[in-house]
A protein has these predicted regions:
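Fold-level signature of zinc-dependent metallopeptidase catalytic domains
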Residues: 1-2, 6-20, 27
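Active-site-flanking segments in enzyme catalytic domains
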Residues: 4-12, 33, 38-318
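Generic structural signal for alpha-helix starts
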Residues: 18-21, 25, 29-41
């Protein structure tokens, strides 16, 4: 059984109802820093009920959680666990990097063995434990997975089901196939956005891509770099309209959706079109090309929660 199959079985065996985390799960879930509000809500509900042990993989994400938990001050790594426990949360915050440092330091090895020798481990960002420590954990009944859900291919996500994918897929995911060299299913993403928006955007992109008559290489480049010069009229027209939209977006200033440094080239490289990038454009669309707005509307399905209002607004303007 491969690592992905094992992880799939793990989530299937430890989920119930809407396939959300079961309270009895004894394990460590490590996320990357770019986790959206929807996933955070899922986590917080369980943190407040002291149901799970949660390990974060970056200080930046903890700061984001700290705001969600309404901590009045910034908590240093050394005080995170204590502070959360005082608030009644059964949570241990420690990054994969610190796990490795701790288990390889003789002075702290005992601490690790006391608290992290059993359970389920999902390591993020490709981090791996020291081989000796890994063997110790396995000897104590631990199951260790180093496969990220964000590295799952599209077929596996479909098998997992939308609820599971929605709950566990990190927002900075780039869906790729097993053969990463081919990058068969790579799609663009935003640095921060909700998974629902990403999912809808992904579906729209696949639908648009699949509706075109393109070669394999053209399909690969369509939403990645778009640097390949093709003979496809449909593809060229799409690129022209996409450039127009990016120009429109790049003129928006002081918007919470555009981080510093989100230049036109950056947004093109990251595939920067989605509801979040258009939300603040609508107030100044009087001079915009109506066909471009219709093009946006075509890319945003109105069947997704949160999209209907935006979709209708685009249609009204167009």
């Amino acid at each position: 059984m491969g690592a992905k199959q094992e992880l799939w079985e793990y989530f299937m065996n430890h989920t119930t109802g809407r396939r959300s985390l079961k309270g009895a799960v004894h394990g460590i879930i490590a996320f990357t820093m770019d986790v959206d509000e929807e996933i955070t809500d899922l986590i917080l509900k369980r943190l407040k009920r002291s149901e799970i042990t949660f390990v974060e993989s970056s200080g930046a994400y903890f700061d984001f959680l700290r705001k969600q938990l309404h901590f009045p001050y910034k908590i240093s790594p050394a005080h995170r666990t204590t502070a959360l426990h005082e608030m009644g949360h059964a949570v241990d915050f420690i990054s994969c990097e610190r796990i490795e440092k701790r288990v390889n330091a003789h002075s702290t090895r005992t601490i690790f063995k006391e608290h992290y020798t059993t359970g389920e481990y999902v390591l993020s960002s490709g981090k791996t434990l020291d081989k000796t420590v890994r063997e110790e954990l396995k000897a104590n009944g631990a199951r260790i997975y180093s496969e990220l859900l964000s590295r799952f291919n599209r077929e596996v996500l479909d098998k997992l089901g939308s609820d599971v994918a929605e709950n566990y897929l990190t927002v900075n995911a780039r869906l790729v196939s097993d053969d990463t060299a081919k990058r068969k299913y790579r799609v663009p993403y935003q640095t921060i956005a909700s998974y629902r928006e990403n999912r809808a955007k992904i579906d729209a992109m696949y639908a648009l891509r699949d509706s075109m008559t393109l070669t394999y290489d053209e399909r690969y480049n369509l939403f990645e770099s778009r640097k390949t010069v093709t003979k496809s009229t449909e593809y060229s027209q799409f690129c022209d309209r996409y450039d127009t939209l990016i120009d429109m977006i790049s003129g928006v200033e002081n918007t919470k959706y555009l981080w510093p440094g989100h230049s036109r080239s950056y947004m093109k490289r990251k595939g920067g079109f989605g509801v979040e990038f258009f939300a603040d454009v609508f107030s100044s669309t009087a001079t915009r090309n109506a066909s471009d707005l219709e093009f946006v509307a075509e890319l945003l399905p109105n069947s997704y929660a949160g999209f209907k209002e935006v979709y209708d607004h685009i249609k009204a303007i167009a």
